[in-house]
């Protein structure tokens, strides 16, 4: 796993944990969790590291603190409903394996992280995709436009935004009926990204 990828995961883990801790009343937090809110903690955790081994240890620390926080709030329905806690509940199993025998979470290798796993603590719908050798984090947009030479102006006739793990052809297939109904479409020209075997 490259340092850049690992640093990104560590930063994401910090953001998720911090949001979850801020969603909790301070009086239920142990000191180990309160320190995450200190400004110096972020600097020490994310930037004062020596090598991949230390980064993995810090990532494991974030997972452990998050798992402990979920145990602390598990009987508090009012807190479990909060956004920061919901994000943490999703994040931990995406980033770690649970060993039922040891009752511990262990950080997953980068290759074991699913493409639809959380990429941002602030926008949980953002996904990761490696498309044609290029890495993309975010969403994908498909736009349909008129393209007849006789039109004085070409007009956007349809657009769709979705998780970027969805293929172009799948998005077109979902929107084609609507586009045809709205535009009286007779011919459709597409780029190579929309091709797929049926």
Which stretches of residues belong to each language-model region?
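Polybasic low-complexity intrinsically disordered regions
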Residues: 1-187, 192, 197
């Amino acid at each position: 796993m490259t340092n850049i990828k690992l640093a990104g995961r560590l930063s994401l883990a910090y953001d998720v944990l911090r949001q979850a801790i801020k969603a909790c009343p301070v009086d239920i937090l142990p000191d180990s969790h309160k320190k995450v809110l200190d400004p110096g903690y972020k600097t020490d955790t994310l930037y004062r590291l020596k090598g991949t081994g230390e980064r993995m240890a810090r990532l494991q620390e974030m997972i452990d603190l998050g798992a402990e926080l979920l145990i602390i709030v598990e009987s508090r329905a009012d807190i479990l409903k909060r956004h920061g806690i919901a994000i943490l509940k999703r994040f931990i199993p995406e980033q770690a394996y649970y060993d039922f025998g040891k009752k511990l979470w262990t950080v997953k290798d980068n290759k074991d992280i699913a493409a639809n796993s959380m990429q941002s603590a602030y926008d949980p719908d953002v996904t990761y995709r490696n498309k044609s050798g290029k890495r993309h984090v975010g969403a994908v947009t498909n736009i349909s436009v008129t393209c007849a030479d006789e039109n004085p102006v070409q007009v956007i006739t349809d657009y769709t935004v979705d998780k970027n793990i969805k293929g172009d052809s799948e998005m077109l297939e979902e929107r084609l009926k609507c586009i045809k109904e709205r535009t009286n479409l007779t011919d459709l020209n597409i780029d190579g990204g929309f091709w797929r075997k049926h």
